[in-house]
Amino acid sequence: MQIIISPAKKMKEDIDSFACRDLPALLPRTRVLLRHLRGLDVPSLRKLLSCNDQIAELNYARFQTMDLERDLTPALLAYEGIQYRYMAPAVFTSDALEYVQEHLRILSGFYGVLRPFDGVRPYRLEMQAKLKTDFCASMYDFWGEDLARLLDGEGVLLNLASAEYSRSVLPHLPPGIRVITPIFGERNGAERVVEKGVYVKMARGEMVRFLAEQGTDKPDALTEFDRLGRSEEHTA
């Protein structure tokens, strides 16, 4: 079973806690993006990233000086969003770390697909960024089928990614792949389930931690997940 999750906007550098094991598998494609991003001025970058001046200036400086092979942070520790705080990888046991290295994949607009111990640099580039160039019509067009090709989950994919990121993978999966997309929410009446954004992010991180602690790759184990209250799952 392979697990996919989204990245987070906020990132940090941590080159001391754990050593990186590898470079991202799609780094040549990342270099193409980096060359383009280095050619943008701050106003153009602000528009592309849909951010304020401060974030645009920060990422302009990042892209201008970025070395994709030095001063790297393991991807699993580089992201600081709610999902990652509830996953709490910094306190994983060695067995749990090996589990996520084998089963967990982080989707990224800049790097494509990341294993937990792939080395990364802080960046801002979301999958929904309106990147239109002479080599692509969008981020989804740029990555195409590349992300799906790198997922090898023995026929089962646990989708813990947002719609923005799962869209880069699900349409390109080969026939026969079972996709499990959990729904984390509360019933509002007899039929409707309401998902709350913050709660969903918390639950996704907790589910990764639960599976890593259990060390299981069996989809049936998901029925035992009971952290943060009830969870339901939908299988496509």
Annotate each PLM feature.
Residues E233-T235:
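Conserved small/polar residues in nucleotide/adenosyl-binding loops
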Residues R121-A129:
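Short, conserved phosphate-binding/catalytic loop or strand-edge motifs used
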Residues D53-P122:
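A glycine-rich, hydrophobic loop/mini-helix early in the fold
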Residues M1-I3:
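Extreme N-terminal starter segment of soluble prokaryotic enzymes
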Residues P7-E13:
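Short polar catalytic/cofactor-binding loops
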Residues D16-Q83:
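Glycine/small-residue-rich interface belts in oligomeric ring/scaffold proteins
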Residues L131-P182:
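A contiguous pocket-lining binding segment that forms or flanks enzyme active sites
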Residues P174-S231:
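Accessory, usually C-terminal, subdomains that scaffold auxiliary metal cofactors
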